[in-house]
Amino acid sequence: MADGEICRCQVTDPPLIRHEDYDCTARMVQKRIEIGPLGVLLNLNMLFHMSRVRHTDVYPCLNNIMSVSVSLDVPVSSGVGVGRARVLIFTTSRERVGIFHGWQVVPGCFLNAPCYSGVDVLSDELCEANIINTSVSSVAMFNRSYKPEDVWILLLTSSTCYGYHDVVVDIEQCTLPSNIDGCVHCSGVCYFNDNHCFCGRRDSNPSNPPCFQFIKDCNELYGTNETKQFICDLVGDANLDSVNTLTKEGWRRFCDVLWNTTYGDVESRTFARFLWFVFYHD
């Protein structure tokens, strides 16, 4: 679990750590995505929490953003030699997008069918790639800040391409989050072991993972055999107490183990990360 979170104190208080000493850019690398001719929809908040940055960076949360830079490697069919990639960045309501996933296929949205209905387009760029240089990039500067969970990236390619390799997203974090509890003693990075400040989280304690804060009051979430089987398939029976699998303590232990153990694969921690940020908003 990350040890710190960004916190901003009142301007009259001397900061313990100045955030200017750190790079405020969060770089996220999405592993290779196989998409065929359809599109892939990325939500910045979900993508961030599924990346290794979320586990190792000094910033365990992604703040409001002012710009997005997307770079991707677009393999081009050798018989044609030229391909196109479309990078569409937009905002829309959660109701329109539906259930969140790190990525999902968007049927019906092809290179020349923008699917703009009900969305606010922030940037729409068509990039060309060729057989020699398959790397393309798109930069979007916003005229206001947006919450990362409200920003989506739709990646599309022409039929002369056969998917994506690594997708790299750079985010400019324009603001530090205001602290709802005052947090008068610290600035910059606030660590859980700093008893002066908990950065607005009253339960910011490594022994009490935030995902458990929601789960402990939600019987529907942990009280089903389907969920039990999913967890056992994901982390193995040996990683959970057989007696406590469907208890609140079992869930707390599951979140803690899945979050803190390095399995060597980003996807191994996807479910815990999903619980962590969806059910416990900053």
From Swiss-Prot:
Protein name per Swiss-Prot or TrEMBL: RNA-4 uncharacterized 31.9 kDa protein
Species for this entry: Beet necrotic yellow vein mosaic virus (isolate Yugoslavia/G1) (BNYVV)
